[in-house]
Amino acid sequence: LEFRRVLFRSNIFGTLANHPDLLRRWLVFASHVLSKNTIAPRERELLILRTGWNCGSRYEWGQHVVIARAVGLTDAEIERVTKGPSNKWGARDRALLVAADELHHDRRIGDETWRMLEEHLSTEQILDLIATVGNYNLVAMFLNSTRVELDAGVPDDPRLG
């Protein structure tokens, strides 16, 4: 897909190139999360967007708005991610967003949310959900700390930082 070619020309990779060993090792895990994940791409992007929003990461949010559109999320759904889980989402999407929020705020998925997830996802998918949110929390910390600049053409949201 075009977004993958664009992603690898992104400012984040230029910054990470300052530490080639870190970049090489992180890419193995990040590649699983982004392209070998057992979660559907649309759902993966819901998780990443919510994580980016929760972490106040303009770069992560903007990059993944582009990717989210490419995998079928509408602009209305993307905006709704900023509001978090609500009854406007279907049960599966709401469970994903609740899990992302719990992982961000509590650093764990609560028992009730785990049961909700089990209604929609396999154990493998739940583990990939945790890995996705965890990876993008790390990425947001990196992006926010090193102040990686937005790439050209990536949407900015002034509500973030």
Which residues fall in each region the model found?
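Acidic/histidine-rich alpha-helical segments that form the ligand environment
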Residues: 83, 92-130
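Short, small-residue-biased leader/transition segments that mark boundaries at the very start
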Residues: 1-7
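Short alpha-helical scaffolding segments that buttress acidic/His motifs in well-ordered protein cores
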Residues: 13-16, 26, 30-33, 46-52, ...
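Short acidic alpha-helix initiation/capping motifs at coil-to-helix transition points
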Residues: 21-25, 56-61, 94-95, 103-111, ...
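Acidic, carboxylate-rich catalytic segments that either coordinate divalent cations
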Residues: 116-118, 142-161
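Conserved alpha-helical segments that form or flank metal/cofactor-binding pockets of metalloenzymes
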Residues: 39, 45, 51-71, 75
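Residue-level detector of well-ordered alpha-helical segments, enriched
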Residues: 25, 42-45, 60-63, 77, ...
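Short amphipathic alpha-helical segments and their helix-coil junctions
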Residues: 23-37, 111-119
